[in-house]
Amino acid sequence: MSKVLLGDVAVEHKETCKGSKDGYPIVGLEHLIPEEITLTAWNEGSENTFSKMFRKGNVLFGRRRAYLKKAAVAPFDGICSGDITVIEAKPDRILPELLPFMIQNDDLFEFAVGKSAGSLSPRVKWEHLKNYEFELPDMGKQKELAELLWAMDNTKKSYQKLIAATDELVKSQFFGSLKRKGSHLIHVV
């Protein structure tokens, strides 16, 4: 393992949409879910002032109010808010599949909060984020680690789906039993 700076293994992706935004998914800070590594929400309309482009595999880092711990990997190309820093892996230095996990961690967010400026809506700049230092294994270990972390994330998501389905089943059974006992109870609920 060797110590590296984030700026040694990743760059800020700076690309702007110069033409029509039609067909591009739009991602705002509200679409980044705290402590979730995958992006699951976005808008489809082009009615906004955003012009910052991101590419599939880039990490979208919520630079405003970093204490909210918002960072997710992009599953597609799109356009995002200026309050999102788009981070791209240097594939010869870090496995792109591992980068989201190196960014979505408490130590980096603590570092980001410490470097943020502003009182009502503190923001951190890439110029500061790139100086975040962390341990990085060789490429072989990075591959093993990325596979393990993605498997864990997929397992977590499967459990979340199971819990949601169980919750819906319990609700339907509960309301079904109320209907059988007397329809007047439904109106009270």
Model segments located where?
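Non-catalytic DNA-recognition/assembly elements of restriction-modification systems
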Residues: 1-17, 131-146, 154, 162-189
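Sequence-specific dsDNA recognition surfaces
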Residues: 4-17, 22-56, 189
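A short beta-sheet element
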Residues: 50-52, 59-104
